[in-house]
Amino acid sequence: ITGQHVAGLPCVLGHEGAGEVVAVGPQVTAVKPGDRVALNWVPSCKTCFFCERDQHHLCPVITRRIFTGYMADGTSRISRSGQPILHYSGISTWADHMVVPEECCQILDPEVPYEVAAVVGCAVATGVGAALHCGDISPGDSVAVVGAGGVGLSAIMGAALAEAGQIIAVDREPSKKHLSIDLGATHFVEADTDAIGKVIELTGGRGPDVVI
């Protein structure tokens, strides 16, 4: 944490959310009123240099603009007493209603509840994405996931999807064990013990193939 990314003030915070589309702008084609959507706080234009190489998180066209507190067109859609209020991560989910770029909207399966869908936009995308796209996990690999919070638990699920043979969850809080195991971990190690030694022991003295 360096403090290099500082949100401007005043702003409406919140970067995870889901809800129902109630209205759309005249040029919107991806969603319509009544659609149930999860919100993605790192949208992409899908046509730039990085997007064409499947590196959507590096897209400069939309992402860099929204980090300044404005919409993709450089304007704010929130105001109070005639004064603009900045957006946060392009979606500002701590509000009853939000104005977001259509690129942020991911249409939901009707059976997915909003409280589950809300965390998909950051915690799940980050953790599962780390396992599937950054970890380069091969079937049968041993994987250690350090931290079993929302992102870590999602990484555990991602490692399971990648068919890792051994998934070791490491966390300071013993109460995280059962949920970690339920979501795919094969072992749980308390971080306040000799965690490194135990992980090495569990992997036959070799250490894990992948650490997240």
Please name every model-derived segment.
Residues 96-97, 103-105, 109-193, 197, ...:
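Mid-domain Rossmann-like dinucleotide-binding core that forms the NAD(H)/NADP(H) cofactor-binding site
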Residues 2-52, 57, 65, 107-111:
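Glycine-rich beta-strand-centered segment in the early N-terminal region that forms part
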Residues 13, 90, 110-112, 191-192, ...:
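Residue-level signature of the cytosolic catalytic core of signaling kinases
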